[in-house]
Amino acid sequence: KYNCAHHELIASAKAVKLAHEIIGEDCMVGCMLAGGSFYPYSCDPKDVWQAKQTERGNYFFIDVQSRGRYPNYALKWMERDGVVLDWQEEDEQILAEGTVDFIGFSYYCSRCDTADPEVSAKRTAANAFRTVRNPHLQASEWGWQIDPLGLRLTQNDLYDKYQKTLFICETGMGG
């Protein structure tokens, strides 16, 4: 799965660079994220850690596409899993030269995560993600958490992290 992702990221960087070359530097090319804050289920440091790790997995593609390099946490995941990327000599330069200009994201609900196996066993579907129900939020009939403040938190998190123009592509009842 990591090599498939790597090839997608290389293709994205090449497409961004090509768009800038053909259309011009005024052309803006972005990437897309199924956005939404990941709250820890509790203030237990293990829950905070779990939520951060889950969020990292969600932001992995944008980390590479926005910064033009793999984040250290992803390299550690691959090392721990014994993954060897199909890395070509020019890939580092391709990623560095093909960073996106903006981040598009959809927001339908926030998500919640926990390290507690008993709570984790009660996950519910939230959009395309399985999440722990946040006891502080109401949910729609589809189980999506209704969290308009989460939209603002997501915007702030994305801008603080990437310093790129943001574009809300989709939103729904939860936002």
List the predicted regions and their residue ranges.
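Active-site region of glycoside hydrolase catalytic domains
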Residues: 1-175
